């Protein structure tokens, strides 16, 4: 039941975010707020996350009940790696980042206030999309092993800093 609630909540969050991006992207230029324009790279990241999520959900649905989350996490990370190609080399902390985002998103489903659930989903997905978009911008088709390892170490250090500074409650509600 917990896994099903998590999948339903994350599916809905991705659907809403992708829909908002699509609607926002087709506004006439006169209505567009310059600071709020969504870069094409971020729209591509949302599509890649959505595709990876669908693959992982399909794989997890056929797994035994006790293994669903583990199968989902592994399939999601594998699909993200396959879809990011060279960008993944500079973003090697995806498994730990996505696992922490998944756990954070699941934690939000047990929060008592709906606004806390929404805030946690929004913050987690925004951070993941932004980080993936930035990694994709700096990725080169051919990278040396040393440069890729250095990028991964730097990124992992940044992820640890973000995780350490994350509050345990939002809006006075326990998350």
From Swiss-Prot:
Coiled coil: none annotated. InterPro entries: Poa_pIX/Phl_pVI, Pollen_allergen/Os. SUPFAM superfamilies: Group V grass pollen allergen (SSF81736). It holds the Pfam family Pollen_allerg_2. Keywords: Allergen. Gene3D superfamilies: Group V grass pollen allergen (1.20.120.320). It comes from the Eukaryota. Belongs to the Poa p IX/Phl p VI allergen family. This is Major pollen allergen Pha a 5.4. The lineage of its organism: Eukaryota, Viridiplantae, Streptophyta, Embryophyta, Tracheophyta.
């Amino acid at each position: 039941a917990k896994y099903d609630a998590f999948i339903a909540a994350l599916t809905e969050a991705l659907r809403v975010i992708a829909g908002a991006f699509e609607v926002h992207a087709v506004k006439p230029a006169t209505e567009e707020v310059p600071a709020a324009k969504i870069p094409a790279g971020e729209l591509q990241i949302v599509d890649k996350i959505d595709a990876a999520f669908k693959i992982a959900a399909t794989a997890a649905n056929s797994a035994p009940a006790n293994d669903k989350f583990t199968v989902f996490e592994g399939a999601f990370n594998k699909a993200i790696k396959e879809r990011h190609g060279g960008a993944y080399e500079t973003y090697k902390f995806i498994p730990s980042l996505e696992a922490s985002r998944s756990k954070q998103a699941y934690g939000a489903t047990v929060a008592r206030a709906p606004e806390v659930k929404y805030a946690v989903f929004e913050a987690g997905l925004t951070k993941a999309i932004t980080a993936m978009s930035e990694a994709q911008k700096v990725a080169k088709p051919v990278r040396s092993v040393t440069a890729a390892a250095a990028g991964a170490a730097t990124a992992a250090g940044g992820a640890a800093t973000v995780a350490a500074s994350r509050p345990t409650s939002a809006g006075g509600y326990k998350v």
